[in-house]
Amino acid sequence: MSLVPEASTSRAPKYCYFFKTLLVEELELETSYHNLHYGQCALIGRLAFKANQYRLENVRVKCLPKKYSLGEGTVSLLILGLTHDKVVENRVSTGRYCIVRGEVVLHNVQHPKGAKLTAGGVYDKINSLSNDPLAQKQYLSALLATYRPAIDLWYIQVIDRAEDLLTRRLEMRSLIEK
């Protein structure tokens, strides 16, 4: 698979103005950042605190066959903007299942206070380099080396029966996308 999208077939991503239900895996395992979800989303997972950062771990998706489903907690996504004070204020705690709403961003892991990027910004940059496929490839390689998907937190809430809720939301999503 090529890192460089075909300029003639690639379409600009449209910002998602509703909290589309996504899997933690869909964001964390995406390596083509120009294909990353652009905009708002809702994620269901288990809150974890690792390496001095709050993260949302994936939840096993019951409706998928085992060979297509990762075990719970296999991957996790950084939650930007979640502080100890917000954890206390929202009555959430590590190990609990949560729904997180926010915006998908790319976070610079080498310079955490650096600028955040979005799939729209990545697309625009790739398009600006459309006459230079080598520059496109170098740009995307540099992104993969320094940026990781994250969620810029807007809201977090503890939930019960996370697997069931996630399954139902994914079923609804598949009906809407048909």
Swiss-Prot record:
Disruption phenotype: Lethal between early pupal and early adult stages. Frequent telomeric fusions in larval neruoblasts.
The protein's role, per its UniProt record: Part of the MTV complex that associates with the HipHop-HOAP complex to form the terminin telomere-capping complex involved in telomere maintenance and prevention of telomere fusion. Potentially functions downstream of mei-41/ATR. As part of the MTV complex binds single stranded DNA in a sequence-independent manner, protecting it from degradation.
Gene Ontology annotations of biological process type: protection from non-homologous end joining at telomere; telomere capping
Additional remark text: Multiple telomeric fusions result in multicentric linear chromosomes that resemble little trains of chromosomes, hence the name 'modigliani', the name of an Italian train named after the artist.
Cysteine pairs bridged by disulfides in the record: none
Compartments reported by the entry: Nucleus; Chromosome; Chromosome, Telomere
Claim: Thylakoid is one of the keywords in the record: no
Main location: nucleus
Classification of source organism: Eukaryota, Metazoa, Ecdysozoa, Arthropoda, Hexapoda
Transmembrane feature ranges: none
A GO CC term assigned to this protein in UniProt: nucleus
Coiled coil: none
Signal sequence, start to end: none
Presence of the UniProt keyword Protein biosynthesis in the record: no
Effect of residue 47 to Q: Disrupts interaction with ver/verrocchio. Partially rescues null mutant phenotype
This protein's UniProt keywords: Chromosome, Nucleus, Telomere
Subunit structure: Probably homodimerizes. Component of the MTV complex, composed of moi/modigliani, tea and ver/verrocchio. Interacts with ver/verrochio and tea (via C-terminus); the interactions are direct and require fully intact moi/modigliani and ver/verrocchio. The MTV complex is recruited to telomeres by the HipHop-HOAP complex, consisting of HipHop, cav/HOAP and Su(var)205/HP1 to form the terminin telomere-capping complex. Interacts with cav/HOAP and Su(var)205/HP1; the interactions are direct. Probably interacts with peo (via N-terminus and UBC domain).
Protein name as it appears in the record: Protein modigliani
